[in-house]
Amino acid sequence: MSPVARDLFTTSFRPFLQGLSVSGYVEGRNVVIDYRSTEGCNDLLPAVLADLLRRQVTVIAAAGNSQVVAAKAATTTIPIVFLTGGDPVKFGFVANLNKPGGNLTGVNTLGLEVAPKRLELVRELLPAITSTALLVNPSNPISTESETKDMQTAARSLGMQLHVLRASSERDFDPVFASIAELRAGALVVLTDAFLNSRSEQLAALALRHAVPAIFQGPEFVAAGGLVSYGVNAAEGWRLVGIYSGRILKGDKPADLPVQQLTKVELLINLKTAKTLGLSVPLPLLGRADEVIE
């Protein structure tokens, strides 16, 4: 269950299937996968979950905080394996990271914790910048509100004005970039969000077209022509979700499976895009990069 359409989910679905195969499960052979997407519309979640409960699914794999909240509210018996950013204990998903209790466990990323670091990268790339745009998904309020506050605190400490812009569907993207131009924001930082992550290619293309230096979470953004990405690798998170889903299908209880945490943060830089934007990437920043696209 995800806010991302199936045709845009390929890069994440493949590692999920790889994770399932660790326990011997292969789609179409001995396991049926019923993929459900809300296409970024959280109003659809109750109906989606009601149908899954009617079908008596064995496990629910859920990506994104809003999806997990809805799934948790819908059932206390069907195991739920989540992939989320932020603190799953703080959000009430589990009682304890090591002994989750209840019917939820999964994978936690450092999505929220590393977000303010992206503003520091903006400062390194553009030392004279005074104004930055922040793109958030308002339909994901659970993590967005907390992360936005952290970003505003970081912006103040850097002497930078932060303009919060919102997009919960593709039709919002053009107005967002029009606002960036009107506000004269010198860069764009995209918050960690499953829907926004799934639109990496569109956002990278728009950032290039409007000559906006942009920083994203995942490597897909840089591969699509974006300038910089800084965050954990979501594909690895999905592989772990697949492994846990397979273990639960084999009989393990989510209450006994510790929440796994992705802690390795990757920095990717697209030098070709930097050149197109007329930017000179500082050598110390290049030296810290895990991958440089030339």
Language-model segments: residues:
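Short hydrophobic alpha-helices and adjacent helix-cap/hinge residues
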Residues: 1-294
